[in-house]
Amino acid sequence: MKTKLKPILTSLLLACGTAMAQTNDCASLTHQALDLSGFNLTIDYMTSALASDQFIQQLRGRQDSEQFFNAIQPVLKKEFSGEILRRELQNRVAALCNAEQMRQTVEKLQSPFIARMLALEAATNSAEGQAKLQRYINIAQTAPPTDDRMEALEKLDESAGVSDFVTDFQMAMFTGILTGAGAPKEILDQIPLRRREMKAQRQNYVELGMSVTYHGVTRPELLQYAGELSTPPLKGFYSLVRKTFVEIVGERSQAMGRDLKPIIAPPTS
């Protein structure tokens, strides 16, 4: 009997060892991919934007400004800490990853052409880059890129899913906050109906921003980049990361809504 059990135990040990190795590989590879792709830097930029007076004003509505500001600051810090969001995103993506596919993603992100484009995006996401971006977007609004270049930028936006991601992020946040605060169903049901309008409002800004970010990049290169982002392994990686991040934002926004309910919930009588 013991002799018969040995092959079974050996197989189980090998399977456990393989699973542990893949788990460790996925954690390391996911960390690399999130760093190389610039998504961790994007999280830092987003959390900084959430703490801005402009964003808080959007949420405040007709509430007393000082009371709302004092209430929301610690809640934002707790639920939307960049460090916590990066760690949670990495853990969730790593739990869903295929080690070989993630290895291919890391290799692709390190390829010369993709690395060059990512470097341009990283420069834009810096504090200095954001200030420059806003200045040049204002100029681009009065003197927009040529039709051919805008067509290439639209194709890149479609492949990269940037406008969709920005829209989904904002919808998840507002839906989460209102859900947590106990908003009535008829109000929550209106949010998905506004998605097309919300995306249209952001798309022009996103694509003008791209024209600044990729200034000096030729039209064929923009189309090449769009092609890379719309095929494996990058397509699967970015889709997974963005979907997972939007889910995290929705969950944390609900928690934020519950914390803010005493000051943003409508009176019951």
Predicted features along the sequence, with ranges:
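N-terminal signal peptide c-region/cleavage motif recognized by signal peptidases
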Residues: 16-21
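N-terminal, post-signal-peptide region of Sec/Tat-exported proteins
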Residues: 44-81
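A cross-kingdom marker for long, charged
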Residues: 199-200, 204-269
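Extended amphipathic alpha-helical interaction segments
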Residues: 123-215, 219
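Acidic/His-rich structured neighborhood in mature extracellular/periplasmic domains
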Residues: 75, 79-155, 159
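Bacterial N-terminal signal peptides that target proteins for export
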Residues: 1-9
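Immediate post-signal-peptide N-terminus of mature secreted/exported proteins
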Residues: 22-56, 142-165
